[in-house]
A protein has these predicted regions:
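An amphipathic alpha-helix adjacent to DNA-recognition modules
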Residues: 3-4, 16-17, 38-62, 77-81
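Helix-turn-helix
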Residues: 9-44, 48
Length: 206
C-alpha cells in the first residue's frame, strides 16, 4: 500500500516535490514511525518502487529471450522496441527522479544492468545470435554489458539531464555503433519515442 500511494504521488507531484509527510497523509493514519520502520528515507521508497517495476521488466525480457521464432538479432530489436514503447515508461519519466542526487537509485540501476539484465537476458540472446549467424562478435559478455550501459545509462536523460537535441545526438551515435557491430536494431520510431520520453521528463522537472 505504501508503494502504491508513493508511486501515485510521485506521478502527480514528481519525486522531488513529494515529501514523506505527503505520503503519510494519504495512508489513513499510518504513523511516520511505521513508515521509517520499513523505509529509512524517501529515496528508499523510490528504490522499492523502481525494483517492483524491474520485476515487470524482467518478465518482458524473459518472454522475448525464450521465443523460438526469432533470431538473436531480431530478439535484440524486439527488446529495444518493447522496452521503450511500454506505457510504464511514461510513468517513470513523469516521476522524474534525479539520479545524480539519489545515489542508491543510480547504483541500483547499474547493479541490475551489469549483474542481472546483461548476463541473464541479453547475453543468452547474443550467444544465440552468434550461433544462428545474425550477430558477429568475439566478445559476447562485453557486448551485452556495453549495449545496456549505453542504452540504460548514457542515453538516459534522467541521469544526464539531456535535452531533446542531446538525446537525438546520443541516439544517432548509438545507432551508428550498433550498425558497426552489424546490428541494425534501432529505427526512427524508437528515436521518436526517446525524444518523446525526454520531453516528458523535462516537463516534469519544471
Amino acid at each position: 500500500m505504501v508503494l502504491d500511494v508513493a508511486f501515485r504521488l510521485f506521478l502527480e507531484k514528481g519525486y522531488e516535490h513529494t515529501s514523506i509527510q505527503d505520503i503519510i497523509n494519504q495512508l489513513g493514519g499510518l504513523s511516520k514511525g511505521a513508515i521509517y520502520h520499513h523505509f529509512k528515507s524517501k529515496e528508499d521508497i523510490l528504490v522499492a518502487v523502481m525494483e517492483r517495476m524491474t520485476v515487470e521488466s524482467n518478465q518482458m525480457l524473459a518472454a522475448i529471450r525464450d521465443r523460438s521464432d526469432l533470431s538473436g538479432k531480431e530478439k535484440l530489436k524486439t527488446i529495444f522496441r518493447e522496452s521503450i514503447s511500454r506505457l510504464v515508461q511514461d510513468d517513470i519519466f513523469t516521476v522524474a527522479p534525479d539520479f545524480q542526487n539519489n545515489p542508491k537509485l543510480l547504483f541500483g540501476l547499474l547493479h541490475d544492468t551489469i549483474d542481472n539484465a546483461a548476463p541473464n537476458y541479453i547475453l543468452p540472446i547474443i550467444r544465440q545470435g552468434i550461433s544462428d549467424g545474425s550477430i558477429q562478435t568475439d566478445y559476447p559478455e562485453q557486448l551485452a554489458e556495453l549495449i545496456l550501459l549505453v542504452a540504460n545509462v548514457w542515453m538516459n536523460p534522467m541521469i544526464f539531464d539531456s535535452s531533446e537535441d542531446e538525446s537525438y545526438r546520443k541516439f544517432m551515435v548509438f545507432r551508428q555503433m550498433m550498425q558497426g557491430f552489424g546490428l541494425d536494431i534501432v529505427d526512427s520510431k524508437m528515436m521518436e519515442r526517446l525524444i518523446e520520453l525526454t520531453s516528458i521528463y523535462q516537463k516534469s522537472r519544471q
